[in-house]
Regions:
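Conserved short alpha-helical segments that host acidic/polar catalytic motifs at enzyme active sites
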Residues: 1-255, 267-300, 339, 434, ...
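Acidic/histidine-rich
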Residues: 156-190, 464, 469-495, 537
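Glycine-rich oxoanion-binding loops at beta->alpha junctions
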Residues: 67, 71-84, 275, 280-293, ...
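Glycine-rich phosphate-binding loops that contact phosphosugars or nucleotide phosphates
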Residues: 294-439, 443-446, 526-567, 571, ...
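Generic C-terminus detector
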Residues: 258, 549, 562-564, 574-615
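Active-site phosphate/pyrophosphate-binding segments
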Residues: 265-269, 273-303, 383, 393-522, ...
Length: 615
């Protein structure tokens, strides 16, 4: 949520900041703003809407020169989306400018105290409170910017990633983070600040990811100093070499990032198991698992914590771990887990799943699990993310940057990683026979080919999308391994097309949802030959008898469901446990085409953010 971009160096800042904000659009936002400093004057432009609206506003209102700049895309938390509430915010004196991602929980008493001291507020935001608090600290004790920020942040309760500029000391930007990500790109005679590395990847491959509770004094022509916010202690930061490249974060000829990412799934699944899966040798080697194998094998249970699509991947993993490795599994919404005083101990293994590695609720769940003595294993996509650093060990999905807000390739690569972990544990425990274990390795190795074949359903998905694009409601049904796929299919549709959709276990249809079925209700049924096929056929017959419109995802060559369904989409035959990797593909394509036909913003759906970094 929200995006931060900053630049201090020798180049013109405006194009760097604007391009950077566009690269962060996937994070979700409702307004944008920029501040430029030309050596004398701070020039600010803000606009409700898109970065393109900001560009128009900036050209009308300010001169766009200056080698220092900060920019922001805002996702409203305090105050409605409008120009006034957009960032950057200036202090009362006009000397300080700030951009902020996060929530200041104690902003109300801080604001009241500042009002008592004569401060006047222009916006409804918590961020304006913070910049004036910094100014008050700075004036009261005659402090330099860095020290004033440090003192002020010790009075703040909440989460933040900030960049602060002081025109009285114009060769410096101060950045700090707690609970929200912040990366600093290091170039020759220049620095870049951003919520992630995508805004500066074309300028430098070296970056420092600030840890929670750290701040950086970024000075032009001087080395950067990183300190602890709590006690001002110096920190020696690790400079990382970035793994992504510019090509990965461009559309590459596709109309939308989401479509590109759907079609990347054969290659990224292969990247996920590359070097880990050795089918011919009967081996799975994952360093994070091997180094902590006894922790997994001695666990009384596995607790999976995640949000959104990652939670659905966790549900698939629940079936896989229990069937393959015979370890009890509980799957928890991270947002609920942390607030219900869960019973956790040192015999538990907690697996935290997050594409971005920055999900606030998942981070909080990790910290709680660690406090209670559990071993915590992370499954993330973004290298160097907060969750990857906070967990005891983990595995990256290697899916590459996922820009579309609605996750696609993150889902299938998460399932791939979790399947490999379950297979490795099954081998160690002897809970799968030698032949069954090898058959799964061999099938997993050819899953990219089957995904590629499933992508050939695109034209069929487009035809069906044209029929149901105006449906007000949809129902998704699946059983066993494909119940989470039904949930994920419904989520994708509602996320990007704004059609109300619900996912249910097919057996639960008779316990309520069947009351909704009539000739106006499209029902998407995941019905592969494996698993509970006869049961799902019975469910389809029940829908048919109530005149529901049936769209079924079936195994290639199926005849029984073909006779009952109004529309079918055929996918290649796959074992029950691996079928979610295949059956989810046509549902992704259906959602995509319906959203496009409805004129929706596929990559940046309304009210949604890619990385939910606030609670």
């Amino acid at each position: 949520m929200c995006g931060i971009v900053g630049y201090i160096g020798y180049r013109e800042a405006y194009p760097i900041v604007i391009k950077g904000l566009k690269r962060l659009e996937y994070r979700g936002y409702d307004s944008a703003g920029v501040m430029l400093f030309d050596g004398k004057t701070m020039k600010v432009a803000k606009a409700k809407g898109k970065v393109s609206d900001l560009e128009e506003r900036a050209l009308q209102q300010i001169t766009i020169n200056g080698t220092i700049g900060i920019g922001h895309t805002r996702w409203a938390t305090h105050g409605v989306p409008n120009d006034v509430n957009s960032h950057p915010h200036l202090s009362n004196s006009g000397d300080l400018a700030i951009i902020h991602n996060g929530i200041i929980e104690n902003y109300a008493p801080l604001k009241a105290e500042l009002i008592n001291r004569g401060y006047v507020f222009q916006s409804d935001t918590d961020t304006e409170v913070l910049v004036n608090l910094i100014e008050e600290v700075q004036k009261k004790d005659n402090l330099k910017l860095g020290k004033a920020v440090q003192v002020a942040l010790n009075q703040v309760v909440g989460a933040y990633a900030i960049a602060v500029f002081d025109k009285k000391n114009p060769n410096e930007i101060v950045a700090a983070r707690l609970g929200s990500p912040l990366a600093i790109g290091i170039g020759e005679g220049e620095y870049f600040i951003a919520s992630d590395a995508s805004p500066f990847i074309e300028y430098t491959s070296n970056a420092v990811y600030l840890e929670d509770g750290e701040m950086a004094n970024i000075r032009l022509h001087k080395s950067m100093k990183v300190r602890k916010i709590k006690d001002d202690a110096l920190v020696n930061p690790t400079i990382q070499e970035l793994q992504m490249n510019l090509e990965q974060i461009e559309k590459g000829g596709y109309d939308h990032f989401m479509l590109k990412e759907i079609y990347e799934q054969p290659s990224v699944i292969k990247d996920t198991y590359r070097g880990r899966l050795h089918a011919n040798d009967g081996l799975i080697q994952m360093a994070g698992v091997e180094d902590n194998l006894e922790k997994f094998l001695n666990a009384d249970r596995i607790i999976i914590v995640a949000c959104g699509t990652s939670w659905h991947a966790g549900l698939v993993a629940e079936y896989i771990f229990e069937e393959f490795a015979r370890i009890p599994v509980e799957v928890e919404y991270a947002s609920e887990f942390r607030y219900r005083n869960p019973i956790i101990n040192s015999k538990d293994v907690v697996i935290a799943i997050s594409q971005s590695g920055e999900t606030a609720d998942t981070m909080a769940a990790i910290k709680l699990a660690k406090e209670k003595g559990a071993f915590v294993f992370g499954v993330c996509n973004v290298v160097g993310s907060s969750i990857s650093r906070e967990t005891h060990a983990g595995a990256y999905t290697h899916a590459g940057p996922e820009i579309g807000v609605a996750s696609t390739k993150a889902f299938t690569t998460q399932i791939t990683v979790l399947t490999m972990i379950a297979l490795r544990l099954a081998k160690a425990k002897g809970t799968l026979s030698h032949s069954v274990f090898h058959s799964y390795l061999q099938e997993l190795e050819i899953i990219p080919d089957k995904v590629r074949e499933a992508l050939e359903t695109n034209d069929r998905a487009k035809e069906i999308a044209a029929v149901f694009k105006d449906a007000p409601n949809c129902l998704y049904l699946g059983r066993g391994y494909n119940f989470p796929v039904a949930l994920e299919g419904a989520l994708k549709l509602k996320e990007i097309s704004y059609i109300h959709a619900e996912g249910y276990p097919a057996a639960e249809m008779k316990h309520g949802p069947i009351a909704l079925i009539d000739e106006q209700m499209p029902v998407f049924v995941i019905a592969p030959k494996q698993g509970h096929y006869d049961k799902i056929v019975s469910n389809i017959q029940e829908i048919k008898s109530r005149s529901g419109k049936i769209i079924a995802v079936v195994t290639k060559g199926d005849t029984q469901v073909r006779e009952l369904a109004d529309y079918i989409i055929e996918v290649p035959e796959t074992s029950d446990a691996l079928s979610p990797l295949i059956t989810t593909i046509p549902l992704q394509l259906l959602s995509y085409h319906i959203a496009v036909m409805r004129g929706c913003n596929v990559d940046q759906p309304r009210n949604l953010a890619k990385s939910v970094t606030v609670e």
